[in-house]
């Protein structure tokens, strides 16, 4: 089983050119599936029938996987089995036609503009703080994904034109603007970057000089949020969601926000219209003389 998995990982990395972060997610899901299969005396992919696929989902649910994670696991298995069919290892893809449990509607959490101001108002001149502030200013200014921020190089940034070149999902490149505050924060970081003895051209590096990891970015943002007195857990997704919501609140241009976020489908961006409506409804309830609800 593992030999075919390794061939698939090589295919994803070399031919599909998936990012390391995405590849790790595929590997994590498929390795978990293998554990479930082998614990139940299934030791080859030819033994995987539709009933076995349903059993894997049921077992995963017993282990505490939520709807969204179950859908991801099924998707990873379905794509892998399809690869085996194309390679002639299987005759049929047993995961085709099997649906994951229906996902409940998910509205991403975001910060309001006052909370963003609270987060980014910090005048520390410590090099690590300058780096962290630059990362967060850029992520909020351009709506970057965590993987896009982490993979930036020095030549990805054009300070003069205030543009950043990012490689998004599917290896698609897009050029994004960033604002004055992000520009100032990046320039302050670049003045002290050499103190970290960088080993490559990564824009953001760790204290050891290596490209900063996804996990380190997440931990630093969580720490920063606590230090700045924010309520709730701060993570990269929340900054990206806040960017999208604030852009819609101020422009209502769904297509433009789609392009900025790098969404291939407009339906993915449309989830933010629900957030926008919630904001408008709250304003209406507070402002309209006949809209105020009884306590």
Curated annotation (Swiss-Prot):
Q: Which one Pfam family would you cite for this protein?
A: Phage_integrase
Core-binding (CB) domain: residues covered: 1-85
Question: Record's CDD domains?
Answer: INT_XerDC_C
Q: Name one GO biological process term.
A: chromosome segregation
> Which molecular function GO terms apply here?
DNA binding; tyrosine-based site-specific recombinase activity
User: What UniProt keywords apply to this chain's record, in alphabetical order?
Assistant: Cell cycle, Cell division, Chromosome partition, Cytoplasm, DNA integration, DNA recombination, DNA-binding
| GO CC annotation | cytoplasm
Q: Where is the Tyr recombinase domain?
A: 106-285
Compartments, as annotated in UniProt: Cytoplasm
Please, which domain of life does this record's source organism belong to?
A: Bacteria
The UniProt entry annotates the active site at: 145, 169, 237, 240, 263, 272 (o-(3'-phospho-dna)-tyrosine intermediate)
Location (main, coarse): cytoplasm
Give the PROSITE patterns listed for this entry.
CB, TYR_RECOMBINASE
- Database matches in NCBIfam families: PRK00283.1, recomb_XerC
Self-association or partners: how does it assemble?
Forms a cyclic heterotetrameric complex composed of two molecules of XerC and two molecules of XerD.
Q: Which family does the record assign?
A: Belongs to the 'phage' integrase family. XerC subfamily.
**Function summary:** Site-specific tyrosine recombinase, which acts by catalyzing the cutting and rejoining of the recombining DNA molecules. The XerC-XerD complex is essential to convert dimers of the bacterial chromosome into monomers to permit their segregation at cell division. It also contributes to the segregational stability of plasmids.
Q: What is this protein called?
A: Tyrosine recombinase XerC
């Amino acid at each position: 089983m593992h030999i075919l998995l390794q061939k698939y990982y090589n295919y994803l990395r070399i031919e599909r050119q998936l990012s390391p972060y995405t590849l790790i997610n595929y590997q994590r899901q498929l390795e978990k599936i293998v554990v479930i299969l082998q614990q139940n005396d299934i030791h080859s992919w030819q033994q995987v029938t539709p009933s076995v696929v349903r059993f894997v989902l049921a077992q995963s649910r017993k282990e505490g996987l939520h709807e969204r994670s179950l859908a991801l696991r099924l998707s990873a298995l379905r794509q892998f089995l399809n690869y085996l069919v194309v390679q002639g290892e299987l005759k049929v893809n047993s995961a085709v036609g099997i649906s994951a449990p229906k996902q409940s509607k998910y509205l991403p959490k975001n910060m309001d503009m006052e909370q963003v101001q609270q987060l980014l108002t910090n005048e520390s001149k410590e090099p690590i703080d300058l780096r962290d502030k630059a990362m967060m200013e850029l992520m909020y200014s351009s709506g970057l994904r965590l993987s896009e921020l982490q993979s930036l190089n020095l030549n990805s940034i054009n300070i003069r034109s205030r543009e950043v070149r990012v490689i998004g999902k599917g290896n698609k490149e897009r050029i994004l603007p960033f604002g004055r505050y992000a520009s100032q924060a990046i320039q302050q970081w670049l003045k002290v970057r050499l103190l970290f003895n960088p080993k490559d051209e990564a824009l953001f590096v760790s204290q050891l000089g290596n490209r900063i990891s996804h996990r380190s970015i997440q931990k630093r943002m969580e720490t920063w949020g606590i230090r700045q007195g924010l309520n709730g857990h701060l993570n990269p997704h929340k900054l990206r969601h806040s960017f999208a919501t604030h852009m819609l609140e101020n422009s209502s241009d769904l297509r433009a926000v789609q392009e900025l976020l790098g969404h291939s489908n407009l339906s993915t961006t449309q989830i933010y219209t629900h957030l926008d409506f919630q904001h408008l409804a709250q304003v209406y309830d507070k402002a309209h003389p006949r809209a105020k609800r009884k306590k």
